Every structure is written in structure tokens, then in C-alpha cells.
């Protein structure tokens, strides 16, 4: 972003300094129920994943459904030609939970309205510092907007999953 490349397709950055914290996220991330056999796919290689490159699929079948929050891969992921081709597949179902009609949301089959940071309680790990901050809800969300936590918890319950973190 120093060069202003974020303004151009494929010029975004993936960044997280969360590893500096010793925060037990077992409850909020469901770490106690993770299945170690679940394949992990590299979001920075989403174009190759969605176009079915075998080396990127982790010995699993092609991806046929996506649920996307807090990302805009159609705009910022590398290898834009592959990303757009992957999202354009007829056999791919994409649900995007988003605040704005981003490039990724425009390619989704379903777009769910998301809250903004002032519309739900949250805790924040620092970006560029080492503090944890409380972000209290200050205003009501408009219309049918829901927080990431509310949507994920509701979806999990709908498919029969149970976890104490869903009730937070």
C-alpha cells in the first residue's frame, strides 16, 4: 500500500498481526471442536482454488460453495483473471455477507447485509500496536443488517451445530 497499489485490481495486501497476542480464542473461534482433517485452502490463491488447480485443492473435491465475510477477493486477490473465472463458474454458489456492494458481492448468488463497527459490540486486537480495545455498540443497525457473529451462529444452528460460542 506504500505505492498506492491498493487502488488497482490485485494490488491489495493480506495482513494480520494477531500472532503477537496470547489470547485464548477457544470459545470465540471454536478451537475445541475443529476437525483436524478439514482441508485448509489458501485465500491468497483463491483463483487457482476456484478454477480447480489440483495442487491447490488439498486432495479434495472442487469448491462448489463459498461463504465470504470480511474479504473482497474479486477486487484484491492475486491472479485476477483466475479469480474472476472461478467466481463466474455456473456450479459455484457464493454467499457474501457485506456492508457494501463490492466486486465480490456483485458476483455472489446471495448477498446478506452486514453491520458496521458502530452497530455491534466487539473486541479488537490492535493493528500496529499491542492493545485490545472494546468497541461498544453505539447505534442500531439499519434494516436487516446482522453482525458476523450473529450470521455465523444462526447458520451453524440451522445446520445442527452446537457450541457455547454461538450463545455469546
Task: Show where each model-derived region lies.
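Generic secondary-structure signature for well-ordered alpha-helical cores
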Residues: 1-8, 116, 137, 157-164
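Extended redox/cofactor-interaction regions of prokaryotic respiratory oxidoreductases
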Residues: 2-106, 115-123
Amino acid at each position: 500500500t506504500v505505492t498506492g497499489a491498493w487502488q488497482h485490481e490485485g494490488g491489495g495486501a493480506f495482513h494480520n498481526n494477531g500472532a503477537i497476542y496470547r489470547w485464548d480464542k477457544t470459545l470465540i473461534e471454536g478451537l475445541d471442536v475443529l476437525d483436524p482433517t478439514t482441508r485448509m485452502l489458501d485465500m491468497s490463491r483463491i483463483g487457482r482454488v476456484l478454477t480447480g488447480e489440483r495442487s491447490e485443492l488439498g486432495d479434495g473435491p472442487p469448491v462448489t460453495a463459498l461463504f465470504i465475510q470480511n474479504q473482497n477477493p474479486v477486487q484484491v486477490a492475486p491472479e485476477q483473471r483466475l479469480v474472476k473465472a472461478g467466481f463466474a463458474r455456473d456450479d459455484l454458489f457464493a454467499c457474501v455477507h457485506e456492508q457494501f456492494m463490492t466486486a465480490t458481492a456483485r458476483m455472489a448468488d446471495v448477498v446478506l447485509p452486514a453491520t458496521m463497527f458502530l452497530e455491534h459490540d466487539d473486541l479488537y486486537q490492535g493493528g500496529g500496536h499491542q492493545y485490545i480495545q472494546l468497541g461498544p455498540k453505539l447505534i442500531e443497525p439499519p434494516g436487516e443488517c446482522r453482525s458476523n457473529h450473529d450470521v455465523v451462529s444462526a447458520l451453524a444452528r440451522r445446520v445442527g451445530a452446537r457450541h457455547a460460542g454461538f450463545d455469546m
